[in-house]
Amino acid sequence: MTDTLASLAYLAGKPTAQAKIKAKPEHFQVREDLGFEFTGSGEHLMVRIRKTGENTSFVANELAKACGVKSKDVSWAGLKDRHAVTEQWLSVHLPKAETPDFSAFLAQYPSIEILATARHNKKLRPGDLVGNDFVVTLSEVSDVDDVLKRLETVAKLGVPNYFGNQRFGNNGNNLQEAKRWGRDNVRSRNQNQRSLYLSAARSWIFNLIVSARLEQSLFDKVLLGDILFKGDEQLLVSAENHADLQSQYDAGDLVISGALAGDNALPTQDDALALEQVFLDAEPDLMALIRGNRMRHDRRAIALKPANLSWQVDGNNIILTFSLDAGSFATSIIRELVQEIAFEREF
């Protein structure tokens, strides 16, 4: 598979150590955190599943059959990796109060477990989660000491908050199609397809902006005209507050943001605007798609700092534990630590 991110900069240089990722399903464990409680009643049956070596859409389709409903009646907050052991909630539109008998379903699919059920008054929609907890094993690590040094840097500074390869499709196909749609002014009623390509377009431009800040040693430097996050508040950097905001950033109180391009003007100014505008101008096909669909500009943190990061060494394996907010990619953490060893999976 092509690494769409291969040309993007690293925080501490490209890793020299190599390791296998997802050598076994249990080497990549994910637990979803919705961040809210269920109402206890309502038309939607919430089903907590643990799946091993299966993708979310397949499990959802099979669960729909087990419940006697259509596939469109089962939804989720986020798609989870196939080559992994993952826990997440699925919602089933099932107005009747009875919970189906899942025994035949579970007997048919030993790779799927049902951990809990509950009732709720709303269906799950994509994005209805606050984050995910991860336990990731890097196996057959070629240079454990180098990875441990890099982990210390990650704990202190975080990593570039890149959108991962998953966002761009197999071999970057979603990104290439996004460029074609923009170039040829393609119009489609397929909302899912359009959403995939728009997401790939904005994500790629954002990645280029973050990479440029790294290459220009501006990843941790506040620029004139930057938009900074302070909790839910956004602050514009001016000549008057520049020094003060840099100090607050250095103290860990502020976060530098990058552009998620839209059809409206960038809100950044001065040096930050000049830096970001270059990459919007460099991708006319992607911008044509974004503007043609009237996407509105948004902002995203350029640095990803994993919460609750810890690690332990087991021979030449390193086991990582961390939590990420929704929309962040565990692969962005791994990318800063090791180069992935290609191998044939047996699952």
UniProtKB/Swiss-Prot annotation:
Protein task: Responsible for synthesis of pseudouridine from uracil-13 in transfer RNAs.
Species assigned in the record: Vibrio vulnificus (strain YJ016)
CDD domains in the cross-refs: PseudoU_synth_EcTruD
Keywords, alphabetical: Isomerase, tRNA processing
Alphabetical GO biological process terms: tRNA pseudouridine synthesis
Domain TRUD span(s) in chain numbering: 158-304
Enzyme Commission number(s): 5.4.99.27
Full protein name: tRNA pseudouridine synthase D
Family annotation (PANTHER family): TRNA PSEUDOURIDINE SYNTHASE D
A Pfam family that the UniProt record links to this protein: TruD
Catalytic reaction annotation: uridine(13) in tRNA = pseudouridine(13) in tRNA
GO cellular component, one term: cytosol
Family per record: Belongs to the pseudouridine synthase TruD family.
Keyword Mitochondrion: no
Active site (UniProt): 81
Gene Ontology MF terms: RNA binding; tRNA pseudouridine(13) synthase activity
